[in-house]
A protein has these predicted regions:
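N-terminal acidic leader/helix
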Residues: 5-35
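Amphipathic alpha-helical segments that form the core helices of the histone-fold
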Residues: 34-45, 57
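Alpha-helix C-capping/helix-to-loop hinge sites
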Residues: 20-24, 43, 62
């Protein structure tokens, strides 16, 4: 499963993140968008592990409260639904 995720992350574009965020009512400014893109590209393994709190702390410092809350909600939702696959 991790190879499949890695291949997806390798192909992920900043526009993919922008479209996904808008679809989920998350309005990111360019700085936030770049930060999330770089975080996903560089730290996706940590996000998929049980040691993801460090990454969430970084997000909290670099996103608006509203965007952070929405992203954390989605993160936990998908972690709960699909975490068993990892």
């Amino acid at each position: 499963m991790t190879n499949l995720i890695k291949k997806y992350i390798d192909k992920l574009t900043i526009d993919d993140i922008r479209k996904y965020s808008l679809k989920n009512d998350i309005s990111l400014n360019q700085q936030e968008l770049n930060f999330i893109y770089n975080t996903i590209k560089n730290d996706y393994n940590k996000l998929l592990s049980d040691n993801y709190t460090e990454i969430l702390d970084k997000l909290k410092k670099n996103l608006s409260k509203d965007n952070y809350d929405k992203i954390v909600f989605l993160f936990h939702k998908y972690k709960k639904e699909y975490g068993y696959l990892l």
